[in-house]
Amino acid sequence: MSNLITIERHILEQQKFFPDAQGELTDLLNDVAFAAKLVRREVVRAGLVDILGFTGSTNVQGEEVKKLDLFANEKIISAIGQHGRFAIMGSEENEGVIIPPKNESGNYALLFDPLDGSSNIDVNVSVGTIFSIYKLKGDDPGKASLSDCLQHGYEQVAAGYVIYGSSVVMVYTTGHGVHGFTYDPTIGEFLLSHENIITPKSGKYYSINEGSYAQFNEGTKRYLDYIKEEDPATNRPYSTRYIGSLVADFHRNLLTGGVFVYPPTTKHLKGKLRLMYEANPLAFICEQAGGRATNGRDRILDIQPLELHQRTPLYIGSVDDVILAEEFEQGIR
């Protein structure tokens, strides 16, 4: 980071790939980066203020809402919505779409998970924000609707995530490579730290919640048994790395190589992760870094969303490792 490239400067340089955007993309991503700074400020001091624990309510997913979840959601909506650059938004925490007060001038839709892995915040484990940006289908922002949010993943114009951990890292793509930035609190800026991230074609790590083993189908069980067997010729056994925070598990595997698997279970036959808030943005990033992302059979970015909170299985990471998991899921092995 000796040349100190800020995220704002980097986004401006990326703007050349979008001559028709007239600077809008720069403003959109800067808005997201600003909102991330606000969330980061509270995450790092969460144990010092009354922001840990549950609110006593549940969100649209049926999950208990944590105070920091609610705070992050409100901050992102207010910080981003006030500038009028997004005509419509969707959050994992809100049942329906969100229409910002100044939406008449916005030409984009924002979908986001305000605080992924928030169940870990009480024990100081990394959490994160995931976001996805789409261009509106129509020309009138005042008529933005749910259909503008229910676009294929391949129609994203930008996607990214922010990890709040020992350091704060923001990773994003606009379809021209994947770039990571580390927050420097002394100057209040995200500085380029990981340029043109390329994920290894194969890795030695797998991330899955094996506590749900009894609920997995036979293909998933055979896959897990296979990757634990000793066979130096195929680099087995794999090592497990599972934090329970999707964005943190994904980020590690993106850099080191490996696969994250959240298969269907008897409890969640259609999968548990959200297509629009989690799978699509991470799949866009993963493919841009040379990886692969599917639901075990179909490419994530090709799935036609039917509802805002649609769920999906997810197999994402290094190409060879994802294909291996798919072969067991499909009964090829």
Curated annotation (Swiss-Prot):
Mg(2+) 1 binds at E92, D113, L115. It is found in: Cytoplasm. Keywords: Calvin cycle, Carbohydrate metabolism, Cytoplasm, Hydrolase, Magnesium, Metal-binding. One of its GO terms (molecular function) is fructose 1,6-bisphosphate 1-phosphatase activity. One of its GO terms (cellular component) is cytosol. Its cofactor is Mg(2+). Mg(2+) 2 binds at D113, D116, E278. It catalyses: beta-D-fructose 1,6-bisphosphate + H2O = beta-D-fructose 6-phosphate + phosphate. Pathway: Carbohydrate biosynthesis; Calvin cycle. The keyword Cytoplasm applies. Binds 2 magnesium ions per subunit. GO terms for biological process: fructose 1,6-bisphosphate metabolic process; fructose 6-phosphate metabolic process; fructose metabolic process; gluconeogenesis; reductive pentose-phosphate cycle; sucrose biosynthetic process. Substrate binds at D116, G117, S118, S119, N209, Y242, K272. Its EC number is 3.1.3.11. InterPro entries: FBPase_C_dom, FBPase_class-1, FBPase_N, FBPtase. Its main location: cytoplasm. Homotetramer. Belongs to the FBPase class 1 family. This is Fructose-1,6-bisphosphatase class 1. It comes from Pelodictyon phaeoclathratiforme (strain DSM 5477 / BU-1).
